[in-house]
Structures are given as C-alpha cells and as structure tokens.
C-alpha cells in the first residue's frame, strides 16, 4: 500500500480539471502536474519513491499527474479497449492504481521483444493516436494494425490492478495496460526526468 489514506487522494482527484493529450500519445484525460496543483502531495510521492532507491538525494524532478480513462468499448476485451505496448523516455516511471474494486485484467503487463528488436511504424502510430484522441477508426483496420504491432512482443509478467498499489519500472521496460475495463480507471502515472545521484538505481 502506497498511501496511508488512499480514499483522501481519490477525493483530491475529483476537485481538479482534466485535459486530453494534444497529440494522442496517451489515452483518456490527465490533470495538471501535481507540483502545480498539489505541491505537498507531489513532495510526499516523490520523496517516498526516490527513497526506495537512495538513502540521501539532494534533488530530483518528476512529472506526475492524475489520469482518468473511460472504456473505449462495452466489450472489455475489445482491442480498442486494450493498451499499446511501449516504453517511456525517462529515467524510470510507473503508476499508482487508485480505482476501487477494479475489474480483472486492468493492471499492467510487462513484455519483451520476441526477436530482440521492435518498432512502431507511422501507420500504427497514426491509428493509435487517432484512437486515443477519440477519432473514428474502422474496427477491422484497427485490429489489423494492433495485431501486427503486438505480434512483436511476448508477455513476461502480469501485474494486477490492486487499489493503492505502486508499480515501478525502468525506462526500457516494455509494458502496457491490459484493458481499460468497464468503468473509469483512475491512476497516478509518474516519470522521473532527473535525479542528482550519479548512478541510477539499477547500478547502485
């Protein structure tokens, strides 16, 4: 359990404004950065995460928001209601699950490349981004591109969505949301962009 009182954190998430991605890079809606709207909460989260790795650390920088994603389909397992495998361009990142009584298969899955390499082409990227922005994409076309892209990966670890659980991974870990479930999915995604210690956690 990450927060002592996660219900109070969920309450905070209801009193703020949310906006969609401007380019379809991620699904749903995100709040403004926590260091701007809830600086004490930001300090608590970043201090606790950073001290998982370092006893002392002079400074750090994170991008942290609340994120809400509503289902893209009435069918939980529709490809349009599933995440896209990706890695994050940061030192490390992760997510705190804040959905009470979440549906099964709404956590995070870790993958590896089947052949030691992978890529996303411009058509796959365009389909994904258009879908995340709420645009209309033909089901057959979407499924074709989704399946072709995801055939590059093999599942290695499946992590359940448990209320108040934190999941953390390094910048080259391939991962995706399993499904977006049948109701609103609330999380706190976080990304470390800078840390004062010379060595990252894996090398310490």
Regions found by a protein language model. Give the residues of each.
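Non-heme Fe(II)/2-oxoglutarate
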Residues: 1-83, 107, 114, 122-133
């Amino acid at each position: 359990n990450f927060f002592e009182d996660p219900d109070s954190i969920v309450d905070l998430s209801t009193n703020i404004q949310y906006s969609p991605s401007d380019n379809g890079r991620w699904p749903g809606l995100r709040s403004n950065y926590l260091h701007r709207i809830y600086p004490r909460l930001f300090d608590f989260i970043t201090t606790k995460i950073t001290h998982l790795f370092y006893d002392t650390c002079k400074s750090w920088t994170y991008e942290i928001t609340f994120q809400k994603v509503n289902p893209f389909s009435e069918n939980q397992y529709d490809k349009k209601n599933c995440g896209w495998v990706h890695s994050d361009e940061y030192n490390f990142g992760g997510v705190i699950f804040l959905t009470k009584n979440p549906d099964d298969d709404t956590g995070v899955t870790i993958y590896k490349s089947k052949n030691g390499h992978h890529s996303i082409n411009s058509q796959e990227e365009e389909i994904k981004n258009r879908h995340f922005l709420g645009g209309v994409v033909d089901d057959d076309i979407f499924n074709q591109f989704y399946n072709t892209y995801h055939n590059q990966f093999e599942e290695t670890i499946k992590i359940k969505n448990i209320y108040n659980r934190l999941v953390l991974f390094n910048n080259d870990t391939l991962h995706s949301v399993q499904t977006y479930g049948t109701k609103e999915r609330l999380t706190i995604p976080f990304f470390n962009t800078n840390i004062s210690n010379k060595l990252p956690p894996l090398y310490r």
